């Protein structure tokens, strides 16, 4: 069984430029994933969802050791993996991922986040989760 405290680095993964609809409150990260919200904590590692459905957003079911063994055969990837241990490719809502990609053209992470947040406020459903207010994608 993987050690989720070290095999998944929530901070690095969320800030890697894959995900733009997130908020951080201390040890808690809130990620909008389509019509759901994921609350993630690093220590102790914990995932809670608004929908109460199990998610593998951080790909907890992947064999991280096997993946690293295969991808680090490339020298550049090997060097990068040492700088960002626990960085994961996320399993996010496909429609949200596609729109995020379109919005990201010729932009930077703060602007992409702002544009997507405005889309959520304009068209998303307003919900309360863990005593906080969010707009779903």
Model feature map: region roles:
Residues 1-137:
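HhH-family (HhH-GPD) DNA N-glycosylase catalytic core used in base-excision repair
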């Amino acid at each position: 069984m993987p050690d989720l405290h070290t095999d998944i680095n929530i901070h690095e993964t969320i800030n890697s430029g894959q995900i733009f609809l997130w908020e951080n409150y201390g040890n808690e990260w809130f990620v909008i994933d389509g019509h759901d919200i994921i609350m993630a904590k690093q220590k102790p590692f914990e995932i809670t969802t608004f929908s109460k459905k199990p998610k593998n957003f951080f790909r907890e079911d992947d064999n991280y050791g096997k993946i690293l063994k295969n991808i680090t055969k490339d020298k550049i990837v090997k060097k990068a993996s040492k700088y960002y241990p626990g960085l994961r490719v996320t399993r996010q809502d496909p429609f949200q991922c596609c729109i995020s990609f379109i919005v990201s053209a010729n932009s930077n992470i703060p602007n992409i986040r702002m544009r997507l947040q405005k889309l959520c406020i304009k068209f998303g459903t307003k919900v309360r989760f863990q005593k906080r207010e969010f707009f779903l994608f």
